[in-house]
From Swiss-Prot:
Designated name of the protein: Glycerol-3-phosphate acyltransferase
Organism: Francisella tularensis subsp. tularensis (strain SCHU S4 / Schu 4)
TM segment ranges: 8-28, 53-73, 81-101, 116-136, 155-175
Pathway connected to this protein: Lipid metabolism; phospholipid metabolism
Subunit structure: Probably interacts with PlsX.
Name of the gene: plsY
Keyword Iron: no
One cellular component term from this protein's GO annotations in UniProt: plasma membrane
Catalytic reaction list: an acyl phosphate + sn-glycerol 3-phosphate = a 1-acyl-sn-glycero-3-phosphate + phosphate
Topology relative to the membrane: Multi-pass membrane protein
Family: Belongs to the PlsY family.
Entry keyword Transferase: yes
Catalytic class of the enzyme: transferase
Record keywords: Cell inner membrane, Cell membrane, Lipid biosynthesis, Lipid metabolism, Membrane, Phospholipid biosynthesis, Phospholipid metabolism, Transferase, Transmembrane, Transmembrane helix
Location in the cell: Cell inner membrane
Length: 204
C-alpha cells in the first residue's frame, strides 16, 4: 500500500468520525441524541428529537461522509479494491469515532454515500429497497437492514469477490450494530417512523 492509498483511508476514517447528529443537535440546542430516544446518534433519532430539518441536515452530512472519500479514492487511485476499503473505513469512522470515544451511530446513512460513490446503481438499489420496506412496514430499522443486505451483496454481481469483501464486512458490522433493533422487531416493540422520542431506553 502506497502513501496515497494510506492517506485516503485515514482521511475516510477521520471524516467518518465527525458525528453529524451530535453536532446538529448541539447547534439546534436539542437534547443529545445519546441521552434521549433510542440513544443512537443518528438521523432517525434526530428526527424523533428535533423534527425534519435537523434530521435532514444530519442525513445529508452523514451521506457526504461516505460519498466524498469514496469519490476521492475512485478518482485518485482508479483501484476498485482501495475504493471499497475506503468505504469500509468511512463506516468504521462513523460507528467507532475517535472524536467521540469510539461510540457512534450505526452507519446506514454513511453507507448510502459510499454506495453512491462506488456505483450509483448500488446506491439506487439501497434507496428503492429502503423506501419499499419503509412504506410497507414503517420500520426504519427493518428498512435499513434489508436495504443494507441487498445492496451490499449486490456488489458481488458488479465486481469480483475481493472488491465485494469490504462491503460484506460493512453489512455484517451494521447488522451487529442493529442487534437491539432486531430483538425489538421480533418482539414487536420497535419504534416506527414518526414516533416521538422518549427518555433513553436500552436501544442503541
Amino acid at each position: 500500500m502506497n502513501f496515497l492509498n494510506f492517506s485516503i483511508l485515514i482521511f475516510a476514517y477521520l471524516l467518518g468520525s465527525i458525528n453529524s447528529a451530535i453536532i446538529v443537535c448541539y447547534i439546534f440546542r436539542l437534547p443529545s441524541p445519546r441521552s434521549v430516544g433510542s440513544g443512537n446518534p443518528g438521523m432517525t433519532n434526530v428526527l424523533r428529537i428535533g423534527g425534519k430539518v435537523p434530521a435532514a441536515i444530519t442525513l445529508i452530512f452523514d451521506i457526504l461522509k461516505g460519498l466524498v472519500p469514496v469519490v476521492i479514492a475512485k478518482v485518485l487511485t482508479g483501484n476498485e479494491f482501495i475504493t471499497a476499503c475506503t468505504a469500509l473505513y468511512a463506516i468504521l469512522g462513523h460507528i467507532f469515532p475517535i472524536f467521540f470515544g469510539f461510540k457512534g451511530g450505526k452507519g446506514v446513512a454513511t453507507l448510502i454515500g459510499t454506495l453512491f460513490g462506488f456505483s450509483w446503481i448500488l446506491g439506487l438499489i439501497f434507496v428503492i429497497t429502503w423506501l419499499c420496506v419503509a412504506i410497507i412496514t414503517r420500520y426504519s430499522s427493518l428498512s435499513a437492514l434489508v436495504a443494507t443486505v441487498i445492496a451490499s451483496f449486490s456488489v458481488i454481481f458488479t465486481s469480483d469477490l475481493q472488491v465485494a469483501a469490504p462491503f460484506l464486512i460493512i453489512a455484517i458490522i451494521i447488522l451487529v450494530k442493529h442487534k437491539g433493533n432486531i430483538q425489538r422487531l421480533i418482539s414487536r416493540q420497535e419504534s416506527k417512523i414518526g414516533d416521538k422520542a422518549k427518555a433513553k431506553n436500552d436501544s442503541n
